[in-house]
Amino acid sequence: HVIEPSAGADRATLAFLCEAYCEDEAPDENGNLQSRVVLRLNPRLAPIKAAVFPLVKKDGMPEVAQDLYRALKKKFNVFYDEKGAVGRRYRRQDEAGTPYCITVDGQSLQDQTVTIRDRDSLEQVRVKIDDVVSEIEQRVLPN
């Protein structure tokens, strides 16, 4: 008799994806609950660690967002998106499993802070632009 165990990356990947897939409800831009698909991958396993969005494509927000994107890109696989409403951009990243979305808005231009949104809790916190890389690093690679 021959025992031939099989344990490949395919099965582990499928197990992670099946465990992470979730459908829940979250408020849209108008405060109405909408169904959303979320890939709740552990931040260490998520292929894209963060996404950077300017709230609108004017008033200097894209330039600030692109600078932040370039700074994050040095340490992490990050995504930049400026197409469509910010709520839709959040939903696209939720589906892709991106744990954190960073939004540059009007307040960012005044006080040099951005909003970091957590995919799982939907919590949003303001963080100084200069601290974003270390903040994402602490969240993605906790000690």
Predicted regions and their residues:
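NTP/phosphate- and nucleic-acid-binding module
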Residues: H1-N143
